[in-house]
């Protein structure tokens, strides 16, 4: 039995993250609310973890070891977080916003990405632990 809710949750969450991000840019939420960026990275990490778990359930038949699933999910979250931070750094360099302050921000972003991934993994792992693995 495959948990059909994973794909549904992942699609709904990515749509919500996209709407929140576009709204934040247009309404300057990232400037007005300093915590908003952390929330968005948490949700982004959560979404990546959902997508990774969906991939595992649909394409990897041997997934019984929860530690291997956890490592896979967190590595996916970190990989996407690092790619996003490289993108952000490139954009900041392109528009000439730079400085050492971007390093602590990048570290904070990666921490919140990872926290979102961990929370998503724990929730999904708990909801699916009684399902039969195919």
Where are these regions (language model features)?
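Bulky hydrophobic segments
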Residues: 1-104, 114-134
């Amino acid at each position: 039995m495959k948990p059909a809710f994973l794909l549904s949750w992942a699609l709904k969450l990515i749509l919500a993250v996209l709407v929140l991000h576009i709204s934040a840019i247009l309404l300057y939420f990232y400037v007005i609310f300093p915590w908003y960026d952390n929330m968005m990275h948490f949700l982004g990490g959560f979404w990546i973890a959902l997508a990774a778990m969906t991939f595992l359930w649909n394409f990897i038949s041997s997934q019984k070891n929860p530690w291997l699933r956890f490592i896979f999910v967190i590595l996916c979250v970190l990989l996407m977080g690092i790619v996003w931070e490289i993108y952000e750094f490139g954009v900041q360099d392109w528009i000439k916003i730079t400085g050492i302050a971007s390093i602590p921000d990048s570290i904070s972003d990666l921490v919140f990405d990872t926290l979102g991934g961990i929370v998503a993994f724990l929730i999904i792992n708990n909801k699916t632990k009684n399902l039969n693995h195919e």
